Amino acid sequence: MLNLKGRSDKKSKNIIGIIQSCLILVLVILIIFMMIQISWLQGTARVINYAGLVRGATQREVKLEITENRNEELIKYLDDILSGLRYQDGHYELVKLYDKEYQEKLKIQSDYWEKLKTEIEAVRSVGYENTDIVNMSEIYFKMADETVFAAEKYSEKIATKIRTIEILSAFDMLC
């Protein structure tokens, strides 16, 4: 009888050990997932900020062109930021957002920026009254808004995933 009780206790301890090992493994996996999500989140605030800078600086550039104050440096600055947002090149240390919606909106915005630059050249040649610069600027502003909102949405999705992993980790530790 004593022998059966000893085996039962040993079996229970083994089961508890296996359960604890599984819970530790789950916790390690959750921590790895959290680290991956955090690495994706790092830099998104900078991307959101620079996407917003493009929106405002483009409006400034159009205003300057309308008032016949050329600013090639501002155009180059905008080119550099858009390139950094799209290709992670340049000196702004911008990260890539792995979000299809954001990437699509950024591509559309970048393509339209090229058209807007052509219109800026037309303003310089024939005056803003004879171009569609104001309307194009408004369209571009809305595109830039959509790009910023897509980046914010991506950031929020990652933050939600991290929060879920935190909750699961806490639950795992309580078990």
Name each model feature, range by range:
Residues I75-N130, M136-I139, M143-E146:
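Heptad-repeat alpha-helical coiled-coil/4-helix-bundle sensor or tether segments in soluble regions
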Residues I24-I31, A57, E61, S83-Y87:
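Hydrophobic alpha-helical transmembrane segments of multi-pass membrane proteins
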Residues K10-I38, A170-C175:
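Extreme N-terminal signal-anchor transmembrane helix of membrane signaling/transducer proteins, especially
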Residues M1-K10:
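Short, Lys/Arg-rich, polar N-terminal cytosolic tail immediately upstream
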Residues I16, Q20, I38-G52, K96, ...:
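Short, solvent-exposed segments of well-ordered alpha helices
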Residues Q59, I66-N69, E73, R86, ...:
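Alpha-helical coiled-coil oligomerization motifs
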Residues I38-K76, I158:
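Juxtamembrane membrane-water interface segments immediately C-terminal to a transmembrane helix
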